[in-house]
Amino acid sequence: MQYTPKFQAMADAAQAKAEGIEPSSVNERIANGAIALDIRDPDEHAKSHIEGSLNISRGKLEMIVEDKIPDLETEILCYCNANNRGALSAASLKDMGYVNAKYVAGGLNAYKAL
């Protein structure tokens, strides 16, 4: 998908702000208490997702995340299909005080390619 320059600049800034983690570390992190957060729309989540992941679509994230994940110390692994929405979500969560919000580098596509 071709993105507008302004959107891509925002996504690049988000990737610089939030840590991107390797897809190969996702399962171990989940086993150690991290939450995989699928920020894609529910129809995308229904088709394929990381097993055990929580689904909060990007458009509702900031409105409901505190009810779903009240602990600001929780490691949260945001993901979309690739990078941008995951990184934007992780950066937004960091702004909200979630100190361990990260994104899965390469998103679900990279995770499934393992």
Predicted feature residues:
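Rhodanese-like catalytic fold shared by cysteine-dependent sulfurtransferases
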Residues: M1-I35, P42-E75, N81-L114
